[in-house]
Design a protein with these regions (language model features):
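Short amphipathic alpha-helix with an adjacent loop that forms part of the alpha/beta core around
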Residues: 143-152
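A conserved beta-strand element that flanks and buttresses the S-adenosyl-L-methionine
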Residues: 157-158
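Short, glycine-/aromatic-enriched active-site segment of Class I SAM-dependent methyltransferases
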Residues: 198-213
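A short, conserved alpha-helix within the catalytic core of class I
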Residues: 165-178
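Rossmann-like AdoMet
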Residues: 1-91, 95-138, 151-152
Length: 280
């Protein structure tokens, strides 16, 4: 029995990025593999013909490479933290149908997937929680969810493609709250500068009827811009297209490597890592 997805629903907004991760796995098999996305797409009753057609253009294929690199980079940071904190909480903020937590599972960590209640309802159908895993319905800006995370063994939080839709003040409040609640933990997320965020916003701001793009979270120099938020923050960043992988693979053209460099250097596409020091 396939899981039917209707057009113009919350479910549809979840399966488009899922489909993108499947396409990434096909286009760049040496660089990225999301078995869960491939498997879930098979279980879904939905007309993917338009998404399939749209996925094969030049810039769409580069967009797929962006998705692949972002997921790989965040997973690298999660695994790196687990090396020194094997019993940590691995927390996916704004998880959608992403299975990065599972792909990083070391057999002893605790996995938490957080998103809005209507999203978690779909996730529970398609990706029910496994061992040491919990799907938590919440609004990330309402910090009641803090109490549901067992961070006794440390915690690594990650957000993929999430904070572009947050106001700068919302990200700041969340980071400050996390510094209070989770000393010794780490938050990693992707970010970009104002120019890039304006380009991202073009698609969704029209429907959201939001005028002031400038209020939305964007970063050029993460260390100098975010460190003043709180004295306990240790902020580092690296380019998310080429900062973790040189992309010297037969599936990636020289033109795409050039675009990747433009993204990292001119758009400041980056993975930001925020370490939370001890309590004040």
């Amino acid at each position: 029995m396939k899981y039917k997805i209707e057009k113009n629903t919350v479910q549809e907004t979840l399966i488009i990025p899922l489909f993108a991760r499947k396409v990434c796995s096909e286009l760049y098999p040496n660089l990225y593999r999301d078995e869960t996305a491939v498997r879930l797409i098979e279980k879904i009753d939905y007309d993917f013909s338009e998404a399939e057609k749209n996925s094969r253009g030049l810039m769409q294929r580069f967009g797929s490479l962006e998705v692949a690199m972002r997921q790989n980079d965040l997973a690298w940071e999660v695994r790196d933290y687990l090396k020194t904190h094997p019993n940590a909480a691995v927390v996916n903020l704004g998880c959608g149908l992403d299975s990065t937590g599972r792909s990083c599972d070391n057999g002893s960590c605790k996995i938490y997937n957080l998103d809005f209640p209507d999203v978690i309802a779909v996730r529970n159908e398609l990706l029910p929680a496994g061992d040491r895993e919990e799907n938590i319905p919440c609004d990330l800006n309402n910090t009641e969810w803090f109490s549901k995370i067992d961070a006794s063994g440390g915690a690594v939080f990650f957000a993929s493609g999430v904070f572009y839709y947050f106001l700068t003040e919302q990200v700041k409040a969340l980071v400050q709250g996390m510094a209070d609640a989770f000393p010794g933990s780490v938050l990693v997320f992707d970010a970009a500068n104002r120019t890039a965020v304006k380009m991202i916003a073009k698609t969704w701001l029209k429907s959201a009827k939001i005028k002031d793009v400038g209020a939305y979270f964007a970063v050029s120099d993460a260390k100098s811009e975010l460190s003043p938020w709180d004295s306990r923050l240790q902020v580092t960043s690296r380019g998310y297209m080429l900062g973790y992988n040189d992309l010297r693979d037969s599936s990636v053209s020289g033109f795409f490597r050039f675009l990747a460099k433009v993204g990292d250097d001119m758009m400041k596409m980056q993975i930001v890592k925020v370490g939370f020091g001890g309590r004040k």
